[in-house]
């Protein structure tokens, strides 16, 4: 029997992948359009209350459901904090940022977590969506950052200006320099307020 666990334990049976997320909404059309725009997703099925979308070889990665009686999302309520999507490279993340900005969709919190360079957005229901790239080339390096002094001192990260990041990228500043974690830059004092809403 071959094991499929991340740590090589052949007795543990773990999922092979995260398949999809389903979001309930009372803003069906806005939500479908937003996720189609943000993820450049294709709709594989849609009727008046359900839409199934994908952006890769999976049959669907996200579904939007408008079941009767759904109320607005409670601000600061318990539950899922955000969904995160990883891009192939720095160039794709910057191109996505610029495409979304041109469509009037801007991040509420751009953060360099050290592990990842991330931009958090809010969908029409207020759910957070993180678009990110890894700041390291290997899983071992990423796991190593969890054990670093930088991470233990600040496990959230530091804010950055995405317009300035894009400007520097187009000016030819090396990607490694742009992804570099700079703990001295600090965290936006309003970060937790922005993220908790």
Predicted regions mapped to residue ranges:
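Histidine-centered active-site/metal-ligand motif
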Residues: 20, 59-62, 82, 113
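Charged, low-complexity, helix/coiled-coil-prone segments
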Residues: 32-46, 64-71, 173-181
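N-terminal "first-domain core" detector
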Residues: 2-56
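Vicinal oxygen chelate
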Residues: 2, 16, 23-29, 84-128, ...
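Short secondary-structure capping micro-motifs at structural edges
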Residues: 50, 71, 83, 107-108
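Conserved short beta-strand elements that form part of the metal-binding/catalytic scaffold
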Residues: 42-77, 122, 128-136
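Short, low-complexity disordered segments enriched in Ser/Pro/Gly and basic
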Residues: 15, 76-80
